[in-house]
Amino acid sequence: MSYDTRLREARKRAGLTQEELGKLVGCAKTTITGYETGKSEPNMAILSKIMEALKVDANFIFQDEMREHYEYH
């Protein structure tokens, strides 16, 4: 599962809409949509706010990406 799918999953588990999450982290709904569809990536400051709002950590968000990195190196 990619980071964008995990973001969407975590947001839904938190019971938030894209608009609500955007307001919590200071982004537009369209920005959150971009993150969740993989069309854009949040910078570290926004990602930190998203993880705090969704009560998840980087291990949850990026676990597959980290696994793939270590499998290839």
PLM features: residue spans?
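Recognition helix of helix-turn-helix/homeodomain-like DNA-binding domains
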Residues: 26-41
